Amino acid sequence: MDHVEETEILAATQRYYVERPIFSHPVLQERLHKKDKISESIGDKLKQAFTCTPKKIRNIIYMFLPITKWLPAYRFKEYVLGDIVSGISTGVLQLPQGLAFAMLAAVPPVFGLYSSFYPVIMYCFFGTSRHISIGPFAVISLMIGGVAVRLVPDDIVIPGGVNATNSTEARDALRVKVAMSVTLLTGIIQFCLGVCRFGFVAIYLTEPLVRGFTTAAAVHVFTSMLKYLFGVKTKRYSGIFSVVYSTVAVLQNVKNLNVCSLGVGLMVFGLLLGGKEFNERFKEKLPAPIPLEFFAVVMGTGISAGFSLHESYNVDVVGTLPLGLLPPANPDTSLFHLVYVDAIAIAIVGFSVTISMAKTLANKHGYQVDGNQELIALGLCNSTGSLFQTFAISCSLSRSLVQEGTGGKTQLAGCLASLMILLVILATGFLFESLPQAVLSAIVIVNLKGMFMQFSDLPFFWRTSKIELTIWLTTFVSSLFLGLDYGLITAVIIALMTVIYRTQSPSYIVLGQLPDTDVYIDIDAYEEVKEVPGIKIFQINAPIYYANSDLYSSALKRKTGVNPAFILGARRKAMKKYAKEVGNANMANATVVKVDAEVDAEDGTKPEEEEDEIKYPPIVTKSTLPEELQRFMPPGDNVHTIILDFTQVNFMDSVGVKTLAGIVKEYGDVGIYVYLAGCSAQVVSDLTQNQFFENPALLDLLFHSIHDAVLGSQVREALAEQEATAAPPQEDSEPNATPEA
């Protein structure tokens, strides 16, 4: 078989032929039989919901306490090695990040270690993701620090006359109290949202919004770390324009920078950048990523202790890391009214980051995570952790990738990482007291690389979606200059406004037919597509509701070029010309079709109807004009059917239905039929509930598809033409007579 024959056979087999009736809605319903649905009473539903069975109890336990499901099924020989390696790798990264992120949270470094221990243990019991690493996260830590600095600024005067500049410990103790209160309220909010099954709130934080927000947060973190890198003493700012004030403060004091501190920081910065590039390039050959941050901490501590950098060169170091765990303490709930806005923002951002990474890794490894249970888990981690003086936590992106990439299989990997932190807290913490803060600053800045790379989103969104570009930019700018809390609120409002804008200003398309097919596509996009004679097909890609119904009606008339008011006015003028030529003065007052209101002869407009009155359209028949009158009619007055493609309309409200009824009636007044094609069951239900089909004959306007509507229109016109040809001439009939519907 040669290539030509094969091509011909292939072309023949890639066709389909269908012979079926034209499916209007009534015809289709006659062919279908709805399935009987058993509707349960409210009493039956309540009885079923509160029925207690062993299986239901077991499922509830599995849902609320996931460890009871995955731990008994733990494959020891298959999982244990990967979890151990992953736990150690994550733990050595969690140590320096915990110390560094405590600086962002404006609390002593040891509290970063507490926050790397307690919440991780809690998540092991209640979390559903096997691979994410829970603990301090730069963005959340910065948001906590913003609240702490706002309520306890650097120059605060402690009650009793002790100035904060002379009592750093007293100031830090107050900031810890603020951080505990914010963390407790954040946990309560997350837990309540999870119990109420509000896990869907994350969908309102779109990807452009989250990426713009985290990029702005990265700039905030970067500016916050500059003073530690340069070794200068500056006031820490929070709130509106804090990033500007922080940058200006560092630049004003740059002449006082500590050269030794900057040198150590830059050395670690270069080591980490080069090492991370090495890890990325040879990740396929390395059994596990090199723990660069841990080596940087060890090296920085060794150099600082060996050369007495703090005593000899005034390099700021971590300072005292008290051994042992602190006893539980009650957070100060009296601060809730001062921090509730921040707590809401932290709760939502923390959950959004966590569920995003959890779903990404779950999809990669073929399991599911429960968004509502993740909210509950985060809520318990934060609320319980606050009792042990931790600050709010979330999922760390960098540590999660390490935990997954080094072979972690279950939540036990995170548990092992937290045990390494516990070892530091109980026994070895004093070894890191000489660690320069510049080293921690360099670690934080290097880990911001991934967030700064998100600036590359801008050209991508410029090419793909200007609306998503707008969301990204407005989120970034508002979060950068208004602060992360108010910036997030502004961003969510802007994102919701874009949803309204998209539905209020959808795309309107006039469709044409690909010749000899049942395919209908945009007539302006392809040369081969042609309009069906006498038929206009109009498509909208959004629901029709109160926000866009008037725009839909206007767009229909504008895009199709068929405006009933103009047609009526033009026909009036044609009648006048015709009457003048035949010398029949009475013809000037004749009407072309039956209408429900007087129409102005000049512009074809109607007087306003009563606002609350919904007049649903009658079934109209097109009038027959005298043949002599046709030459006076305006060009293009030959459209007999408008087909509204509703395949992309997913719902209609009462205002939309009223507008549609007005459209059908308005076109019907000039003898033009309006058909609805491709209505979903929901749209048909909306039309029915709003009494659009009060006249049952209007069901004949509904067709299963565009092609059904086109064929139905052509059959109707052909039958009308046959009847007009077969009907005997009526010499006594008046030219303005209108056939009865």
Curated annotation (Swiss-Prot):
CDD domains: STAS_anti-anti-sigma_factors, STAS_SulP_like_sulfate_transporter. Salicylate binds at residue 398. Glycans are attached at residues 163, 166. GO terms for cellular component: plasma membrane. Residues 244-248 dip into the membrane without crossing it. Residues 106-109, 148-178, 231-243, 249-261, 304-338, 389-396, 430-436, 484 are extracellular. It catalyses: 2 hydrogencarbonate(in) + chloride(out) = 2 hydrogencarbonate(out) + chloride(in). Disulfide bonds: none annotated. The keyword Glycoprotein applies. One of its GO terms (molecular function) is secondary active sulfate transmembrane transporter activity. Residues 1-79, 126-137, 284-291, 362-370, 407-410, 460-467, 499-741 are cytoplasmic. Residues 721-730 have a biased composition (Low complexity). GO terms for biological process: cochlear outer hair cell electromotile response; regulation of cell shape; sensory perception of sound. Residues 505-718 are annotated as: Extended region for STAS domain. The record marks 399 as: Contributes to anion binding. Keywords: Cell membrane, Cell shape, Glycoprotein, Hearing, Membrane, Motor protein, Transmembrane, Transmembrane helix. Residues 525-713 form the STAS domain. It is a multi-pass membrane protein. A motif (Involved in motor function) lies at residues 158-168. The keyword Disulfide bond does not apply. Gene3D superfamilies: STAS domain (3.30.750.24). Homodimer. Interacts (via STAS domain) with CALM; this interaction is calcium-dependent and the STAS domain interacts with only one lobe of CALM which is an elongated conformation. Belongs to the SLC26A/SulP transporter (TC 2.A.53) family. Voltage-sensitive motor protein that drives outer hair cell (OHC) electromotility (eM) and participates in sound amplification in the hearing organ. Converts changes in the transmembrane electric potential into mechanical displacements resulting in the coupling of its expansion to movement of a charged voltage sensor across the lipid membrane. The nature of the voltage sensor is not completely clear, and two models compete. The STAS domain mediates dimerization, with both STAS domains latched onto each other in a domain-swapped manner. The N-terminus domain is involved in dimerization such that each N-terminus domain embraces both STAS domains. The STAS domain harbors a unique anion-binding site important for the fine regulation of the high-frequency electromotile properties. The transmembrane domain consists of 14 transmembrane segments organized a 7(+)7 inverted repeat architecture that can be divided into two main helix bundles, the ''core'' domain and the ''gate'' domain. This is Prestin. It comes from Tursiops truncatus (Atlantic bottle-nosed dolphin).
